[in-house]
Swiss-Prot record:
Pfam families (alphabetical): 7TM_GPCR_Sra
Protein name in the entry: Serpentine receptor class alpha-21
GO cellular component terms, semicolon-separated: membrane
Family the UniProt entry places it in: Belongs to the nematode receptor-like protein sra family.
Amino acid sequence: MSQLTAEELDSQKCASEGLTSVLTSITMKFNFLFITTVILLSYCFTWLAIRALWKNNIFSNSTRLILIACLLNSVVHQTTMLESRMRQTYRSFVFASEPCNLLYRSSDCVFELHSYYLTGYFSTYSVCSLAFDRLVSHYKSKFYHTHQYFIAVSLLVLQLLLTLVSFYIAYYGVHLAGYVPVCIHYPRLAVHYSTVNTVRTVVMVCCLVVTGFIYYLSVKSEKQIQKSSYSPGKRYTAYENVTTSQSVCILIVLKLFCNMLSSIGINLLLLMGEVVSEGTFVLVALFLPGVTYANLCLPLVIYFKTKLIIRNRKFRIAVMTSMYGDAGEHIDRLKKSWE
Protein backbone atom coordinates (compact mmCIF):
# COMPACT_ATOMS: atom_id res chain seq x y z
CA MET A 1 0.00 0.00 0.00
CA SER A 2 1.57 3.24 -1.19
CA GLN A 3 2.15 6.20 1.11
CA LEU A 4 -0.49 8.89 0.66
CA THR A 5 -0.66 12.46 1.93
CA ALA A 6 -2.95 13.48 4.79
CA GLU A 7 -5.24 15.29 2.36
CA GLU A 8 -5.55 12.23 0.13
CA LEU A 9 -6.27 9.99 3.10
CA ASP A 10 -8.95 12.35 4.42
CA SER A 11 -10.70 12.21 1.07
CA GLN A 12 -11.07 8.41 1.25
CA LYS A 13 -14.12 8.33 3.50
CA CYS A 14 -15.82 5.47 1.72
CA ALA A 15 -14.57 1.88 1.92
CA SER A 16 -13.55 0.32 -1.37
CA GLU A 17 -15.61 -2.50 -2.81
CA GLY A 18 -13.01 -5.07 -1.74
CA LEU A 19 -12.73 -3.70 1.79
CA THR A 20 -16.52 -3.52 2.15
CA SER A 21 -16.76 -7.15 1.07
CA VAL A 22 -14.17 -8.18 3.67
CA LEU A 23 -15.65 -6.16 6.55
CA THR A 24 -19.13 -7.60 6.00
CA SER A 25 -17.99 -11.15 5.22
CA ILE A 26 -18.71 -14.35 7.16
CA THR A 27 -14.96 -14.75 7.68
CA MET A 28 -14.80 -11.43 9.53
CA LYS A 29 -17.72 -12.42 11.74
CA PHE A 30 -16.00 -15.72 12.51
CA ASN A 31 -12.88 -13.75 13.38
CA PHE A 32 -14.91 -11.65 15.81
CA LEU A 33 -16.28 -14.76 17.53
CA PHE A 34 -12.83 -16.34 17.67
CA ILE A 35 -11.12 -13.26 19.15
CA THR A 36 -14.01 -12.76 21.58
CA THR A 37 -13.60 -16.35 22.77
CA VAL A 38 -9.86 -15.81 23.30
CA ILE A 39 -10.54 -12.63 25.27
CA LEU A 40 -13.25 -14.16 27.47
CA LEU A 41 -10.99 -17.13 28.23
CA SER A 42 -8.19 -14.72 29.11
CA TYR A 43 -10.51 -12.96 31.59
CA CYS A 44 -11.35 -16.25 33.31
CA PHE A 45 -7.76 -17.44 33.56
CA THR A 46 -6.51 -14.01 34.61
CA TRP A 47 -8.82 -14.20 37.61
CA LEU A 48 -7.59 -17.72 38.40
CA ALA A 49 -3.96 -16.67 37.94
CA ILE A 50 -4.30 -13.66 40.27
CA ARG A 51 -5.91 -15.92 42.89
CA ALA A 52 -3.06 -18.40 42.50
CA LEU A 53 -0.46 -15.64 42.89
CA TRP A 54 -2.27 -14.29 45.95
CA LYS A 55 -3.10 -17.54 47.77
CA ASN A 56 -0.74 -20.21 46.41
CA ASN A 57 2.22 -18.19 45.20
CA ILE A 58 5.19 -20.21 43.90
CA PHE A 59 7.20 -17.18 42.77
CA SER A 60 9.33 -14.68 44.65
CA ASN A 61 7.53 -11.52 45.78
CA SER A 62 9.37 -9.50 43.14
CA THR A 63 8.35 -11.82 40.30
CA ARG A 64 4.82 -12.02 41.66
CA LEU A 65 4.41 -8.22 41.67
CA ILE A 66 5.64 -7.99 38.07
CA LEU A 67 3.26 -10.76 36.98
CA ILE A 68 0.27 -9.16 38.71
CA ALA A 69 1.03 -5.84 36.98
CA CYS A 70 1.20 -7.69 33.65
CA LEU A 71 -2.11 -9.46 34.30
CA LEU A 72 -3.89 -6.19 35.15
CA ASN A 73 -2.38 -4.57 32.05
CA SER A 74 -3.65 -7.49 29.96
CA VAL A 75 -7.22 -6.88 31.15
CA VAL A 76 -7.09 -3.29 29.85
CA HIS A 77 -5.60 -4.43 26.54
CA GLN A 78 -8.15 -7.21 26.03
CA THR A 79 -11.03 -4.90 26.92
CA THR A 80 -9.87 -2.33 24.37
CA MET A 81 -9.63 -5.03 21.71
CA LEU A 82 -13.08 -6.40 22.56
CA GLU A 83 -14.72 -2.97 22.55
CA SER A 84 -13.18 -2.08 19.17
CA ARG A 85 -14.18 -5.38 17.59
CA MET A 86 -17.74 -5.15 18.92
CA ARG A 87 -18.11 -1.67 17.40
CA GLN A 88 -16.70 -2.86 14.08
CA THR A 89 -19.01 -5.89 13.98
CA TYR A 90 -22.01 -3.71 14.81
CA ARG A 91 -21.17 -1.39 11.91
CA SER A 92 -20.75 -4.35 9.56
CA PHE A 93 -24.40 -5.27 10.20
CA VAL A 94 -25.96 -1.80 10.33
CA PHE A 95 -24.01 -0.24 7.43
CA ALA A 96 -23.47 -3.34 5.28
CA SER A 97 -24.89 -1.51 2.24
CA GLU A 98 -23.40 1.90 3.11
CA PRO A 99 -19.64 1.78 2.47
CA CYS A 100 -19.26 5.47 3.36
CA ASN A 101 -20.36 4.74 6.95
CA LEU A 102 -18.33 1.58 7.52
CA LEU A 103 -15.00 3.20 8.38
CA TYR A 104 -13.83 5.22 11.38
CA ARG A 105 -12.06 8.53 11.12
CA SER A 106 -8.61 8.05 12.68
CA SER A 107 -8.95 11.19 14.78
CA ASP A 108 -12.03 9.64 16.45
CA CYS A 109 -9.96 6.69 17.67
CA VAL A 110 -7.50 8.54 19.93
CA PHE A 111 -8.56 6.72 23.10
CA GLU A 112 -8.35 3.26 21.52
CA LEU A 113 -5.01 4.14 19.90
CA HIS A 114 -3.43 5.09 23.23
CA SER A 115 -5.02 2.30 25.24
CA TYR A 116 -4.31 -0.50 22.76
CA TYR A 117 -0.73 0.33 21.82
CA LEU A 118 0.47 1.50 25.24
CA THR A 119 -0.78 -1.68 26.91
CA GLY A 120 0.55 -3.73 24.00
CA TYR A 121 4.04 -2.30 24.35
CA PHE A 122 3.87 -2.64 28.14
CA SER A 123 3.02 -6.31 27.69
CA THR A 124 5.94 -6.83 25.32
CA TYR A 125 8.49 -5.15 27.58
CA SER A 126 7.37 -7.22 30.56
CA VAL A 127 9.88 -9.78 29.29
CA CYS A 128 12.64 -7.27 30.14
CA SER A 129 11.38 -6.95 33.70
CA LEU A 130 11.14 -10.72 34.10
CA ALA A 131 14.57 -11.33 32.56
CA PHE A 132 16.30 -8.73 34.75
CA ASP A 133 14.40 -10.03 37.77
CA ARG A 134 15.96 -13.46 37.17
CA LEU A 135 19.35 -11.89 36.50
CA VAL A 136 19.42 -10.00 39.81
CA SER A 137 18.06 -13.04 41.64
CA HIS A 138 20.95 -15.18 40.45
CA TYR A 139 23.90 -12.79 40.71
CA LYS A 140 22.78 -10.68 43.70
CA SER A 141 20.83 -13.25 45.68
CA LYS A 142 21.12 -11.64 49.14
CA PHE A 143 20.25 -8.16 47.86
CA TYR A 144 17.38 -9.63 45.84
CA HIS A 145 15.75 -11.40 48.78
CA THR A 146 15.98 -8.35 51.05
CA HIS A 147 14.82 -5.74 48.49
CA GLN A 148 12.26 -7.62 46.39
CA TYR A 149 9.58 -4.93 46.23
CA PHE A 150 12.14 -2.23 45.44
CA ILE A 151 13.50 -4.36 42.58
CA ALA A 152 10.03 -5.09 41.22
CA VAL A 153 8.94 -1.44 41.30
CA SER A 154 12.22 -0.32 39.69
CA LEU A 155 11.81 -2.85 36.87
CA LEU A 156 8.18 -1.87 36.32
CA VAL A 157 9.22 1.79 36.06
CA LEU A 158 11.85 0.79 33.47
CA GLN A 159 9.19 -1.22 31.64
CA LEU A 160 6.89 1.82 31.60
CA LEU A 161 9.68 4.07 30.29
CA LEU A 162 10.42 1.64 27.43
CA THR A 163 6.70 1.61 26.65
CA LEU A 164 6.46 5.40 26.52
CA VAL A 165 9.62 5.73 24.41
CA SER A 166 8.35 3.17 21.89
CA PHE A 167 4.97 4.88 21.68
CA TYR A 168 6.66 8.27 21.27
CA ILE A 169 8.85 7.00 18.41
CA ALA A 170 5.98 5.26 16.65
CA TYR A 171 3.17 7.79 17.00
CA TYR A 172 4.26 11.16 18.40
CA GLY A 173 3.46 13.93 15.93
CA VAL A 174 1.78 11.49 13.53
CA HIS A 175 -1.20 13.11 11.83
CA LEU A 176 -4.33 11.04 12.47
CA ALA A 177 -5.50 11.43 8.91
CA GLY A 178 -7.79 9.23 6.93
CA TYR A 179 -10.16 6.44 7.85
CA VAL A 180 -9.55 3.00 9.36
CA PRO A 181 -11.69 -0.17 9.41
CA VAL A 182 -11.14 -0.78 13.15
CA CYS A 183 -10.15 1.76 15.81
CA ILE A 184 -7.14 -0.33 16.87
CA HIS A 185 -5.70 -0.06 13.35
CA TYR A 186 -2.42 1.87 13.45
CA PRO A 187 -2.45 5.38 11.87
CA ARG A 188 -1.73 5.24 8.15
CA LEU A 189 1.01 7.89 8.43
CA ALA A 190 2.90 6.12 11.25
CA VAL A 191 6.07 5.41 9.24
CA HIS A 192 8.00 3.99 12.22
CA TYR A 193 5.35 1.43 13.14
CA SER A 194 7.13 -1.55 11.56
CA THR A 195 10.52 -0.43 12.92
CA VAL A 196 9.19 -0.45 16.49
CA ASN A 197 7.71 -3.91 15.87
CA THR A 198 11.11 -5.18 14.76
CA VAL A 199 12.85 -3.67 17.79
CA ARG A 200 10.30 -5.29 20.11
CA THR A 201 11.00 -8.69 18.58
CA VAL A 202 14.78 -8.23 18.92
CA VAL A 203 14.38 -7.19 22.57
CA MET A 204 12.32 -10.30 23.29
CA VAL A 205 14.90 -12.56 21.66
CA CYS A 206 17.68 -11.00 23.76
CA CYS A 207 15.62 -11.42 26.93
CA LEU A 208 14.95 -15.05 26.05
CA VAL A 209 18.69 -15.68 25.64
CA VAL A 210 19.42 -14.03 29.01
CA THR A 211 16.67 -15.93 30.82
CA GLY A 212 17.65 -19.22 29.20
CA PHE A 213 21.23 -18.70 30.38
CA ILE A 214 20.04 -17.90 33.92
CA TYR A 215 17.87 -21.02 33.87
CA TYR A 216 20.88 -23.12 32.88
CA LEU A 217 22.95 -21.59 35.70
CA SER A 218 20.10 -22.12 38.19
CA VAL A 219 19.82 -25.81 37.32
CA LYS A 220 23.58 -26.22 37.59
CA SER A 221 23.66 -24.38 40.93
CA GLU A 222 20.77 -26.41 42.34
CA LYS A 223 22.52 -29.70 41.53
CA GLN A 224 25.65 -28.52 43.34
CA ILE A 225 23.65 -27.40 46.38
CA GLN A 226 21.75 -30.69 46.52
CA LYS A 227 25.08 -32.51 46.69
CA SER A 228 26.99 -30.22 49.03
CA SER A 229 24.47 -28.53 51.34
CA TYR A 230 22.15 -29.95 53.99
CA SER A 231 20.50 -26.60 54.67
CA PRO A 232 16.75 -26.81 53.89
CA GLY A 233 16.73 -23.04 53.31
CA LYS A 234 19.47 -23.14 50.67
CA ARG A 235 17.93 -26.17 48.98
CA TYR A 236 14.50 -24.56 48.89
CA THR A 237 15.87 -21.28 47.52
CA ALA A 238 17.79 -23.12 44.79
CA TYR A 239 14.69 -25.12 43.84
CA GLU A 240 12.55 -21.98 43.72
CA ASN A 241 15.11 -20.24 41.48
CA VAL A 242 14.94 -23.15 39.04
CA THR A 243 11.13 -23.32 38.93
CA THR A 244 10.77 -19.54 38.62
CA SER A 245 13.39 -19.29 35.85
CA GLN A 246 11.76 -22.18 34.03
CA SER A 247 8.33 -20.53 34.23
CA VAL A 248 9.73 -17.20 33.02
CA CYS A 249 11.43 -18.96 30.09
CA ILE A 250 8.12 -20.54 29.10
CA LEU A 251 6.36 -17.17 29.34
CA ILE A 252 8.96 -15.41 27.21
CA VAL A 253 8.93 -18.17 24.56
CA LEU A 254 5.14 -17.92 24.27
CA LYS A 255 5.19 -14.12 24.23
CA LEU A 256 7.95 -14.16 21.61
CA PHE A 257 6.02 -16.59 19.43
CA CYS A 258 2.82 -14.52 19.67
CA ASN A 259 4.68 -11.26 19.05
CA MET A 260 6.56 -12.68 16.05
CA LEU A 261 3.30 -14.03 14.67
CA SER A 262 1.95 -10.49 14.73
CA SER A 263 4.95 -8.27 13.95
CA ILE A 264 6.52 -10.46 11.25
CA GLY A 265 3.13 -11.08 9.64
CA ILE A 266 2.24 -7.38 9.56
CA ASN A 267 5.71 -6.35 8.40
CA LEU A 268 5.56 -8.86 5.52
CA LEU A 269 2.20 -7.45 4.46
CA LEU A 270 3.62 -3.92 4.56
CA LEU A 271 6.65 -4.97 2.49
CA MET A 272 4.43 -6.62 -0.12
CA GLY A 273 2.82 -3.22 -0.71
CA GLU A 274 0.59 -3.08 -3.77
CA VAL A 275 0.56 -6.87 -4.13
CA VAL A 276 -1.77 -7.13 -1.12
CA SER A 277 -5.17 -5.47 -1.33
CA GLU A 278 -6.41 -3.34 1.56
CA GLY A 279 -9.15 -5.86 2.31
CA THR A 280 -6.69 -8.77 2.50
CA PHE A 281 -4.36 -6.72 4.71
CA VAL A 282 -7.15 -5.93 7.19
CA LEU A 283 -8.45 -9.51 7.24
CA VAL A 284 -5.03 -11.07 7.88
CA ALA A 285 -4.05 -8.38 10.41
CA LEU A 286 -7.18 -9.01 12.49
CA PHE A 287 -6.24 -12.69 12.74
CA LEU A 288 -2.77 -11.75 14.04
CA PRO A 289 -3.22 -9.77 17.28
CA GLY A 290 -0.13 -11.26 18.91
CA VAL A 291 -0.50 -9.46 22.24
CA THR A 292 -4.10 -10.66 22.55
CA TYR A 293 -2.93 -14.27 22.24
CA ALA A 294 -0.01 -13.62 24.61
CA ASN A 295 -2.46 -12.20 27.16
CA LEU A 296 -4.19 -15.58 27.19
CA CYS A 297 -0.93 -17.54 27.43
CA LEU A 298 0.30 -15.52 30.44
CA PRO A 299 -2.44 -16.51 32.93
CA LEU A 300 -2.55 -20.05 31.54
CA VAL A 301 1.14 -20.59 32.32
CA ILE A 302 0.87 -19.00 35.77
CA TYR A 303 -2.21 -20.99 36.76
CA PHE A 304 -1.22 -24.42 35.46
CA LYS A 305 2.43 -24.06 36.48
CA THR A 306 1.27 -23.23 40.01
CA LYS A 307 -1.00 -26.28 40.09
CA LEU A 308 1.77 -28.52 38.75
CA ILE A 309 4.43 -27.35 41.21
CA ILE A 310 2.08 -27.65 44.20
CA ARG A 311 1.22 -31.19 43.12
CA ASN A 312 4.91 -32.06 42.72
CA ARG A 313 5.70 -30.63 46.16
CA LYS A 314 2.99 -32.73 47.80
CA PHE A 315 4.24 -35.81 45.97
CA ARG A 316 7.85 -35.25 47.07
CA ILE A 317 6.81 -34.68 50.68
CA ALA A 318 4.69 -37.84 50.63
CA VAL A 319 7.56 -39.90 49.20
CA MET A 320 10.06 -38.56 51.74
CA THR A 321 7.82 -39.15 54.74
CA SER A 322 6.68 -42.60 53.64
CA MET A 323 10.17 -43.88 52.79
CA TYR A 324 12.36 -42.34 55.45
CA GLY A 325 10.22 -41.33 58.38
CA ASP A 326 11.08 -37.93 59.83
CA ALA A 327 13.30 -35.32 58.18
CA GLY A 328 16.20 -35.87 60.58
CA GLU A 329 16.41 -39.55 59.72
CA HIS A 330 16.26 -38.69 56.04
CA ILE A 331 19.15 -36.22 56.34
CA ASP A 332 21.24 -38.84 58.17
CA ARG A 333 20.66 -41.28 55.32
CA LEU A 334 21.64 -38.63 52.77
CA LYS A 335 24.86 -37.87 54.66
CA LYS A 336 25.84 -41.53 54.65
CA SER A 337 25.07 -41.91 50.96
CA TRP A 338 27.21 -38.87 50.09
CA GLU A 339 30.26 -39.93 52.15
